[in-house]
């Protein structure tokens, strides 16, 4: 809603709309099958890395990409590995400039995560393993870590 000149009325509530969600990239590898599908004597070591990126794609519209990579290993053998880039396009209105970056880098990936988690669980299950249910992610903590890392490297956030 605007006041006729394209600007929101004073005091308009903040809005965050999901315009689209999609898989940008998905890869699952089971490099040692069928041997990797045999019962394991111990729980595999699972390493997960999560990153968030964002691009402005239009007026008040941002593409946010949640990138999740993982690998399960037993001893020196890789059981499986995966990569997922899951994205959404979000429209953000009436948000103060100082709150825009945290909103995009915390709230948007938080909304995407349950869908990405399901895609990964299904891919791992379809690869012959029990579904991998990722633990919830602290996107506030991830955001703070990335800010600290950028400041240490002298980069803008």
Swiss-Prot record:
It is found in: Cytoplasm. InterPro entries: SecB (IPR003708), SecB-like_sf (IPR035958). Keywords: Chaperone, Cytoplasm, Protein transport, Translocation, Transport. The keyword Cytoplasm applies. SUPFAM superfamilies: SecB-like. GO terms for molecular function: unfolded protein binding. GO terms for biological process: protein folding; protein tetramerization; protein transport. Coiled coil: none annotated. One of its GO terms (cellular component) is cytoplasm. It holds the Pfam family SecB. HAMAP family: SecB. NCBIfam families: PRK05751.1-3, secB. One of the proteins required for the normal export of preproteins out of the cell cytoplasm. It is a molecular chaperone that binds to a subset of precursor proteins, maintaining them in a translocation-competent state. It also specifically binds to its receptor SecA. Homotetramer, a dimer of dimers. One homotetramer interacts with 1 SecA dimer. Belongs to the SecB family. This is Protein-export protein SecB. The gene is secB.
